[in-house]
Amino acid sequence: MKFTIKKEILLDALVKVSKAISTKNLIPVLAGIKFELKKKKLTLTASDNDITIQTTIESLNDEDFKIENEGSIIIQGKYILDIVRKLPDEYINVEVVDELKIFIYTDKSEFNLNGISESEYPNIGLE
């Protein structure tokens, strides 16, 4: 999975879905946000098993949101939100390497996170 997106677009989506994440959840994978990138769309999903919030960002032009490779992964919600919020740059690159390693970078900064396989995320039945 690899894409480049305007910071404000990604941050807006992360803020929306992160409202469903509980810090007291007994299921560790639910502390994450599921990123699904396919068919020119990025879908973010977060849930605490009671409330689920999902939002979709469409790639209408390559200037605001450019998709290079499709894929899906779960990224810890608190970490990704804090990183994106603090980045000073206008564009953010997100790349998954070696299946579960997430590389988030801009012109001036770079971060490495460990992801969780999307197969571990519970099926919440939204479509």
Residue ranges: model-predicted function:
Residues 1-127:
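Structural preference for solvent-exposed beta-strand-turn elements
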